[in-house]
């Protein structure tokens, strides 16, 4: 198999033009997100988070969207993690959702800020108990001697809090919200004539433009 021979024709892609867009990019995202869920895509809330560190070196990883409303796009993490340190150094990020079954991706660019403690607490209480214990056990992005060190830390958390809880929200764990300055909706099309429609925020609100593929 040659990697260069792997191609997708996008012959069955639906049409997508400015007239198809919702007035709000957040409404448009919710429409596409629901369609991704309905299409049975595994983890449609998975998104690539791209950051830049203090030396200007880019980094990226997949995280899970946990809320999307007119304020922005929210995910949760350890505030001592590499991504958190990079966000502190350069609080502008990009998110990318890719839904292959629908030939679609969404790219979100904008500033990023921490969610408040009450909001983080409310989300924390919805997490499975073992996920809470895992967050307690993991000093994210820190070097481990071996797997057993992590297993031992998890067992120590179980011994302390039990499997019924409650487990308190750690001080070094919480959420971030990406506040978009632009959101691009990409629809794959035949002959590589893909549709790229962008909402860009200015002083008057959201403006829409089409970009060449």
What are the residue ranges of the model-derived segments?
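Binding-site signature for planar aromatic cofactors or substrates
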Residues: 1-213
